[in-house]
Amino acid sequence: MPQDQHLGVDKAKILIEALPYIQRFSGKTLVVKYGGNAMTDPELESSFARDIVLLKTVGLNPIVVHGGGPQVDSFLKQLGRESDRIDGMRVTDEATMEVVEMVLGGSVNKSIVNLINKHGGRAIGLTGQDGNLLRARKLLMEKQEEDGSIKHIDLGMVGEVTGVKTDVLEMFTQSDFIPVIAPLGVDEKGNTYNINADLVAGKVAEALGAEKLILLTNISGVLDENKNLLTGLTTQEVDRLIETGVIYGGMIPKVGCALDAVKGGVVSAHIVDGRVPHATLLEIFTDHGVGTLISNRTQTTH
């Protein structure tokens, strides 16, 4: 068989492998948190946008929630300013909040929208302020002191999601738009808050009863004590890995977000290596995926 026919057969096999997943997930909603290297590497940016457009084209309803911490840091540096962080959370005063709103709700959001549209999609940019999409309240971080007492730390204009206006999102997805959400929420008094994008994605997925929550990261997924990738975990197994210290440090918030989403009704959550081109498609439409799947039941395929 000529080489070009071999390549054609290989491509056909890939499509056949994807077919049952396309059929199973047609009409389903998935929420993708977009951040990390996938937002800063031009090749990965392009592959992500094409993945999202393909998902919409084959009948799924993707919703994108994006981060943008490095872009905010870069803009603050240009202004000769820095913002402190406590356990990875940005301390956000009013002046910093103005920059966060401008960068996340402006340049970063519009860049993602334009990229998806460039590849044939119909993306529409939103923040949590639009239509009161994301209701929020001030977040007080809890930190345990050496004596065991709990200290509450004020991070400024940092918030947590208290509600999601699902009708706003459903209006757009039912009209074949792809919502792209900046992680900014608003309280009843009109105060705007900077919210962790992972947490926003998880709450949006919960509120919509999404089929999948996909968190694109700069790691391969959840690793065991020997640093081997765990491709499938139940919520009970995740709880045990946290209790035994296998999951620790900076992974706990991300895994906790996925865990909360599944316990809140999302069918499965995926922690995926966003450094891999087309990671979103590979995780959804192939048998083994490229990350860790977390669900309420044991699964060997994605």
Curated annotation (Swiss-Prot):
The protein's matches in CDD domains, at most eight in alphabetical order, are given as: AAK_NAGK-C (cd04250)
Top-level lineage group: Bacteria
Q: Which GO terms describe its molecular function?
A: acetylglutamate kinase activity; ATP binding
SUPFAM superfamilies, A to Z:
Carbamate kinase-like
The entry's cellular-component GO terms read: cytoplasm
- Which pathway is recorded for this entry? Amino-acid biosynthesis; L-arginine biosynthesis; N(2)-acetyl-L-ornithine from L-glutamate: step 2/4
Q: Which InterPro entries match?
A: AceGlu_kinase-like_sf, AcgluKinase_fam, ArgB, Asp/Glu/Uridylate_kinase, NAGK-C
Q: What is its EC number?
A: 2.7.2.8
> Membrane spanning segments where?
none
Q: Where is this site: Transition state stabilizer?
A: K33, K254
Q: What class of enzyme is it?
A: transferase
Q: Report the subcellular localization.
A: Cytoplasm
GO BP annotations of the record are: arginine biosynthetic process via ornithine; L-arginine biosynthetic process
Chief localization: cytoplasm
Role noted for this protein: Catalyzes the ATP-dependent phosphorylation of N-acetyl-L-glutamate.
Regarding protein family, the annotation reads: Belongs to the acetylglutamate kinase family. ArgB subfamily.
This chain belongs to which protein, by name?
Answer: Acetylglutamate kinase
User: Corresponding gene?
Assistant: argB
